[in-house]
């Protein structure tokens, strides 16, 4: 385990890292994947450890990957105690302040890009849906580095969808409990964001605010999804801006999940929308 402090020597301290022997390079905003504001309590620490362990189980191979974690000082102190025996491919970065972790991770990625430190075999994972990662995601794509965003449902900035090459949802419990695949969750997520829904995935699924049905058609045809929206605010489905956003769905699914799809969106408030 390595501890790198956010001081004037920060850039010099990280510029000597070498990613040649690593496959995935993870940039984890721990507070973002927890989904709650940091708080000094036993419950918060248990939640934080659970979410980070779950992230690592699903996405990290510590024999092949390098992991950067940025968070509030008191959170990093807890991680130091738990992972002190971890080899030097886990880098902890303590930083206080609003959006401090995101800003420092973005700074780190930019430093690595500017100094040509990524290799073509590296795969960059960003565990945050914050929009400030959009410029580095675009920059990574321009130099041929694969990227994936791992984030919470309805917590992904709209600009991220077009910037990253893949999106995976970090709602591990709901994905398992409701047997949801990433494309189904993406459709619910993207439509929720387009309609300004402020709901968690569990609410959307349990209350059937948005339902998604996958039709098993002939394998030579595009996969067809039927999306039903229970209700919308202020007839948003009739808005040109919303329609323009929804029209991007097939292209985004092809980019993010390598699947050609057609979508029919149904709602009592408007005519069917065919994408």
Q: Where do the protein language model's features map onto the residues?
A:
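Short glycine-rich, basic-tinged beta-strand/loop micro-motifs
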Residues: 30-32, 203-207, 215-232
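Nuclease catalytic cores that cleave nucleic-acid phosphodiester bonds
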Residues: 74-203, 207-208, 216, 236, ...
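Domain-level signal for Mg2+-assisted phosphodiester chemistry and nucleotide/NA-binding surfaces
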Residues: 2-101, 141-142, 146, 151
